[in-house]
Amino acid sequence: MDNMVDDKKVNQVVEQGKGIPHAEGADTPGWELPFLLLAGFRSLIDRLHTELAAQGHPDARPAHGFAMQAIGQDGATASELGRRLGISKQAAGKTADRLTALGYVSTAPDPTDARRKLLRLTPHGLDALNRSAAIFESLRAEWAESVGPGRVHDLEAALRTVVPASDRYRLDAAGWLGG
């Protein structure tokens, strides 16, 4: 059968990726690229949230940042939030409730439809996003100091080449990863 599991490849990432250094310029296994990209993303996000906590946002979580970006300056309904994040309306409602409880979001009647409630970022939510942007600038500068500004620029340029423009700033990672 074509869909049989190859026992030699099961857990290849776990077994082969345990800190084995690769020689400069040597070919690496195909699975390593997505894991390195994910690890780089995770490293940046974890450091972002450590710094956000130190700057007055101890309860902010990665999912909250995606949700606040999805709500945006113009606001969004729970249904719109769910669509933008790729999650159910119920999950979006829970996220909105949590953001409201933390003071990042408020609700107001939708001026175009009184039956709907519009989620809006509060000054506290805007502060979290503004601080996030500044922290990301600092983290990028650290990467540039570590590997050189040209290499960071080349990495960004290469990613812009292989990632379609329409996919570069998607906010639905939580829904995609979740299922």
Which functions belong to the PLM regions below?
Residues 1-59:
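N-terminal leader segment of winged-helix/HTH proteins
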Residues 3, 20, 97-160:
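Charged, amphipathic alpha-helical coiled-coil/dimerization segments
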Residues 29, 33, 62-64, 124, ...:
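N-terminal positioning helix adjacent to the helix-turn-helix/winged-helix DNA-binding module
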Residues 31-34, 38, 42, 72, ...:
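Short amphipathic alpha-helical segments with heptad-repeat character
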Residues 39, 65-70, 93-94:
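Base-recognition residues in the alpha-helical recognition helix of bacterial helix-turn-helix
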Residues 46-88, 102, 171-176:
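N-terminal helix-turn-helix DNA-binding core of bacterial DNA-binding proteins
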Residues 78-79, 90, 97, 117:
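Residues within helix-turn-helix
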Residues 153-179:
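Exposed, interaction-prone assembly regions rather than primary DNA-binding/catalytic cores
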